[in-house]
Amino acid sequence: MPPPLTTPLTTLLRIQHPIMLAGMDQVAGPELAAAVTNAGGFGTLGGARYTPKMLKEMIAEMKDLLDRKDAPFGVDLLLPKIGGGARATNYDYTGGHLDEMLDIIIESGATLFVSAVGVAPQWAIDKLHKAGVL
Protein backbone atom coordinates (compact mmCIF):
# COMPACT_ATOMS: atom_id res chain seq x y z
CA MET A 1 0.00 0.00 0.00
CA PRO A 2 1.40 3.46 -0.86
CA PRO A 3 2.27 5.79 2.00
CA PRO A 4 -0.32 8.40 3.03
CA LEU A 5 -0.41 11.60 1.02
CA THR A 6 1.60 14.32 2.75
CA THR A 7 0.46 17.90 2.20
CA PRO A 8 0.91 21.19 4.06
CA LEU A 9 -2.51 20.51 5.64
CA THR A 10 -1.60 17.04 6.90
CA THR A 11 1.65 18.37 8.33
CA LEU A 12 0.11 21.44 9.99
CA LEU A 13 -2.83 19.57 11.53
CA ARG A 14 -0.93 16.32 12.27
CA ILE A 15 -3.38 14.16 10.31
CA GLN A 16 -2.95 11.20 7.94
CA HIS A 17 -5.25 12.27 5.14
CA PRO A 18 -5.93 15.75 3.71
CA ILE A 19 -9.63 15.50 4.53
CA MET A 20 -11.29 18.09 6.72
CA LEU A 21 -14.86 17.91 8.00
CA ALA A 22 -16.75 21.18 7.66
CA GLY A 23 -18.33 22.41 10.89
CA MET A 24 -21.83 22.30 9.28
CA ASP A 25 -23.89 23.82 12.07
CA GLN A 26 -25.06 21.03 14.41
CA VAL A 27 -24.95 18.35 11.69
CA ALA A 28 -21.24 17.93 12.34
CA GLY A 29 -21.85 16.63 15.84
CA PRO A 30 -19.60 14.62 18.13
CA GLU A 31 -20.10 11.29 16.35
CA LEU A 32 -19.28 12.58 12.86
CA ALA A 33 -16.36 14.73 13.99
CA ALA A 34 -14.86 11.81 15.94
CA ALA A 35 -15.39 9.41 13.03
CA VAL A 36 -13.51 11.69 10.62
CA THR A 37 -10.67 12.15 13.11
CA ASN A 38 -10.50 8.42 13.87
CA ALA A 39 -10.26 7.73 10.12
CA GLY A 40 -7.18 9.95 9.86
CA GLY A 41 -8.84 13.17 8.71
CA PHE A 42 -9.58 16.34 10.66
CA GLY A 43 -12.89 16.40 12.50
CA THR A 44 -14.48 19.77 13.12
CA LEU A 45 -17.34 20.02 15.59
CA GLY A 46 -20.11 22.39 14.51
CA GLY A 47 -21.00 24.65 17.43
CA ALA A 48 -23.85 26.79 16.14
CA ARG A 49 -26.49 27.85 18.64
CA TYR A 50 -24.84 26.00 21.52
CA THR A 51 -24.74 27.46 24.99
CA PRO A 52 -21.36 27.29 26.70
CA LYS A 53 -22.60 24.27 28.70
CA MET A 54 -23.76 22.50 25.54
CA LEU A 55 -20.47 23.25 23.75
CA LYS A 56 -18.51 21.80 26.65
CA GLU A 57 -20.69 18.67 26.65
CA MET A 58 -20.41 18.22 22.86
CA ILE A 59 -16.62 18.52 22.97
CA ALA A 60 -16.43 16.05 25.87
CA GLU A 61 -18.67 13.59 24.01
CA MET A 62 -16.54 13.88 20.87
CA LYS A 63 -13.31 13.39 22.82
CA ASP A 64 -14.77 10.27 24.48
CA LEU A 65 -15.32 8.82 20.99
CA LEU A 66 -11.75 9.48 19.81
CA ASP A 67 -9.38 6.52 19.50
CA ARG A 68 -6.47 8.78 20.45
CA LYS A 69 -7.30 11.22 23.23
CA ASP A 70 -4.62 13.62 21.93
CA ALA A 71 -5.98 13.58 18.37
CA PRO A 72 -6.35 16.97 16.68
CA PHE A 73 -9.82 18.45 16.17
CA GLY A 74 -11.48 21.78 15.51
CA VAL A 75 -14.54 23.72 16.63
CA ASP A 76 -16.62 25.95 14.36
CA LEU A 77 -18.73 28.82 15.71
CA LEU A 78 -20.92 31.13 13.64
CA LEU A 79 -19.80 34.72 14.13
CA PRO A 80 -21.63 36.91 11.61
CA LYS A 81 -21.07 40.65 11.66
CA ILE A 82 -23.67 42.40 13.80
CA GLY A 83 -24.52 46.09 13.45
CA GLY A 84 -22.35 48.58 11.60
CA GLY A 85 -23.78 47.91 8.14
CA ALA A 86 -24.42 44.19 8.61
CA ARG A 87 -27.65 42.59 7.43
CA ALA A 88 -30.49 43.24 9.84
CA THR A 89 -31.16 39.48 10.07
CA ASN A 90 -27.71 38.73 11.53
CA TYR A 91 -27.58 37.98 15.22
CA ASP A 92 -25.19 36.74 17.88
CA TYR A 93 -25.31 32.93 17.78
CA THR A 94 -23.16 32.80 20.93
CA GLY A 95 -25.77 34.69 22.95
CA GLY A 96 -23.09 37.07 24.22
CA HIS A 97 -20.93 34.20 25.49
CA LEU A 98 -18.12 34.25 22.91
CA ASP A 99 -15.37 34.84 25.48
CA GLU A 100 -16.57 31.94 27.64
CA MET A 101 -16.91 29.69 24.59
CA LEU A 102 -13.37 30.52 23.50
CA ASP A 103 -12.16 29.55 26.98
CA ILE A 104 -13.93 26.19 26.59
CA ILE A 105 -12.37 25.66 23.16
CA ILE A 106 -8.90 26.50 24.48
CA GLU A 107 -9.28 24.33 27.60
CA SER A 108 -10.49 21.40 25.47
CA GLY A 109 -7.21 21.27 23.59
CA ALA A 110 -8.73 22.09 20.20
CA THR A 111 -6.18 22.45 17.42
CA LEU A 112 -8.18 24.77 15.20
CA PHE A 113 -10.91 27.38 15.55
CA VAL A 114 -13.18 27.94 12.55
CA SER A 115 -15.60 30.78 11.95
CA ALA A 116 -17.29 29.74 8.74
CA VAL A 117 -19.76 32.62 8.91
CA GLY A 118 -18.12 35.95 9.56
CA VAL A 119 -14.74 36.95 10.90
CA ALA A 120 -13.90 36.57 14.57
CA PRO A 121 -13.07 39.83 16.36
CA GLN A 122 -9.35 40.56 16.56
CA TRP A 123 -9.31 40.11 20.35
CA ALA A 124 -10.71 36.59 19.89
CA ILE A 125 -8.12 35.69 17.25
CA ASP A 126 -5.35 37.03 19.49
CA LYS A 127 -6.65 35.04 22.47
CA LEU A 128 -6.81 31.80 20.45
CA HIS A 129 -3.37 32.27 18.90
CA LYS A 130 -1.83 33.09 22.29
CA ALA A 131 -3.21 29.75 23.53
CA GLY A 132 -1.77 27.88 20.53
CA VAL A 133 -5.06 27.38 18.68
CA LEU A 134 -4.79 27.89 14.92
List where the protein language model places each region.
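Active-site entrance/lid segments in N-terminal catalytic domains of soluble metabolic enzymes
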Residues: 1-134
